[in-house]
Amino acid sequence: MFWGIEISKVPVKFTPAFDLHITTACLSAVAKDTGRNVLQVKYDGKTYSLCSLKLNATEHSVLDTNFEEGKEVEFSVSGNNTICLTGYFVDSMFGDDEHGEDEDNEEEEGEEGEDEEMEGEDEDEDEEDEDEEDEDEEEEDDEEDDEINKELERQILEQALKRKAQIEADKNKQQKKPKQEEPVKQVTPVKPTAQAAKPTAATTTTTTTTTTTPTKQTTPAKPAAKPVTPTKPVTPTKPVEAAVVEKKKPTSSVVTLPSGLQYEDLVVGSGPSPKSGKKVGVKYIGKLTNGKTFDSSLRTPFTFRIGIREVIRGWDIGVASMKVGGKRRLTIPADLAYGRSGAPPSIPPNATLIFDVELVSCAQ
């Protein structure tokens, strides 16, 4: 249930009928004084300062303050402007139901986590089986390539041996021919020595032919070098290298929205998504771009109603698309956070903020 009140210099006493959660303090629309305005609250006999606002500098402040029902609260302003406070009543009955729902959600998330672990183990086993199958296929391909190369080498060797044997056979034939003509050298008896000179001439001619002809037969040895070319089929390894290079290309998981907000899902939730105007619970840690932590809520979830500007715009936009159980890193530019004024002293002006947010609950 919505609650609002205007506070000025005159103290205002108020006793809430239900637990009260104050979320926002801002200067009135008719504020004119440029001096500092400090919002103070008196509770349990003690006075506390909630925030300090200044016209044209810090006109708005996000609060997270709770007051118990039935306990008197006194608000006042130290300054000349009026400050508007807004928040909502927290119904105790609704809080108990929500607490029960959170416990149920935790149990369901535990069961879902176990199922996801089992599924993850099955997927890991499937991936290992696939990797082993791929390795077996690669080994089979390598073995086939080795067998093909061995077969080519065997064929080349057989061809070379056949050609070598053919050349040797041709040489032997050429060498045998002069030996068969050698009987011509025998001189018939009782013949003049002049006639015996003729066979010698014949022998010289035959010897010249035998010495010249083998050189012509050596030329067929050239084709023996050509069969070496079948080793080229090894080149198909290039597409494999290209495929490996393509796998190494990085893929970015950061999403940039038109508003300038960036988010990266660290864990994708499996629960329901928030609805506008409904209360959500988140655990978070906020850092500046230099890594300095300025705020966090890791033990107790921070609760707010999404989509109605109870928090900075970067949260309304970044949390709206999450699911319960999800974890997301939000990089929020200054215009979606605290703008030019910042939130001194922890957040400087024009600061880009980085939040690691976990959505733990959302009302449906």
From Swiss-Prot:
Keywords: Chaperone, Isomerase, Nucleus, Rotamase
Top-level EC class: isomerase
Highest taxon of source: Eukaryota
GO CC term, one of those recorded: chromatin
Documented EC number(s): 5.2.1.8
Cellular localization per UniProt: Nucleus
The protein's name: FK506-binding protein 4
Organism for this UniProt entry: Dictyostelium discoideum (Social amoeba)
